[in-house]
Curated annotation (Swiss-Prot):
Listed SUPFAM superfamilies: Ribulose-phoshate binding barrel (SSF51366)
Subcellular location: Cytoplasm
One Pfam family cited in the UniProt record for this chain: His_biosynth
Full protein name: 1-(5-phosphoribosyl)-5-[(5-phosphoribosylamino)methylideneamino] imidazole-4-carboxamide isomerase
Organism in which the protein naturally occurs: Bacillus subtilis (strain 168)
NCBIfam families: 1-(5-phosphoribosyl)-5-[(5-phosphoribosylamino)methylideneamino]imidazole-4-carboxamide isomerase
Active site, UniProt feature: D11 (proton acceptor), D132 (proton donor)
GO molecular function, one term: 1-(5-phosphoribosyl)-5-[(5-phosphoribosylamino)methylideneamino]imidazole-4-carboxamide isomerase activity
Gene3D superfamilies: Aldolase class I (3.20.20.70)
Length: 245
């Protein structure tokens, strides 16, 4: 069994499963009324992990869809990682103590480094750093802001503070089904020497295989969203192929 992990994604907005194009809240497609039902479907297809995003939370800077997150973590046999709207120690504590496996800190890595460093010290690899980049520069606040900070620079800095897992999203490819940015993902893994999960742009099983070929360099998994919802391939197909690589 390959260690390369596939993370089916459920993006939640107003309690529903949605997809946005390049993080644009005006370009939303609803794919289901129940995040729990969707997660259960992925579990039946063989998922071990699920990647949840609280889009309302990312925009509002506080947890909004946490009820759905906790229900999935407690009732299904899935490891859950959650991002979006996690800004305080209490947010992190409540998710982890409710059975969530990993909490993703994104915007706060730029806006509140002391908080992120403290959480890394306290929880180690239960914390993933979400690095969302536009043209190589870190983007924050639900992708509404772009900073002057390079993703690789921030990655190296946080790796020195104890970050073990990064989730790298290239915003230009997200929701576009145009193929992931393999080059930038590998670059981040090499620069930090840590585990990097790729997010954004996966459109085919071949895309997943292209990422998985870089596992030795630290690319440890891929998040799949729109490709599953638009039936480009099934999760069970993808799991089977990546396992055989």
């Amino acid at each position: 069994m390959s260690a390369f992990t596939l993370y089916p994604a459920i993006d939640m907005r107003n309690g529903k499963c949605v997809r946005l194009v390049q993080g644009d809240y005006n370009k939303e497609t609803i794919y289901g009324d129940s995040p729990y039902d969707m997660a259960e479907l992925f579990e039946k297809e063989g998922a071990e992990w699920i990647h949840l995003v609280d889009l309302d939370g990312a925009k509002e800077g506080k947890r909004v869809n946490d009820r759905h997150v906790i229900e999935i973590a407690q009732k299904l046999n899935l490891k859950v990682e959650i991002g979006g709207g996690i800004r305080s120690e209490n947010d992190v504590y409540e998710y982890l103590s409710a059975g969530v496996e990993r909490v993703i800190l994104g915007s706060s890595a730029v806006s509140n480094p002391p908080f992120v460093k403290k959480m890394l010290k306290q929880y180690g690899e239960k914390i993933a750093i979400g690095l969302d980049a536009r043209n190589g520069f870190v983007s924050t606040e639900g992708w509404l802001e772009t900073s002057t900070l390079k993703a690789t620079e921030l990655g190296k800095e946080l790796a020195n503070e104890g970050a073990e897992v990064f989730i790298f999203t290239d915003i230009a490819t997200d929701g576009m089904l145009s193929g992931p940015n393999v080059k930038s993902t590998v670059e981040l893994a090499k620069e930090t020497g840590k585990s990097v999960i790729a997010s954004g742009g996966v459109s085919s099983v071949a895309d997943l295989e292209a990422l998985a070929r870089n596992e030795a360099d630290g690319v440890s998994g891929a998040i799949i969203g729109k490709a599953l919802y638009t039936n480009q391939f099934t999760l069970s197909e993808a799991l089977e192929r990546v396992k055989r690589k």
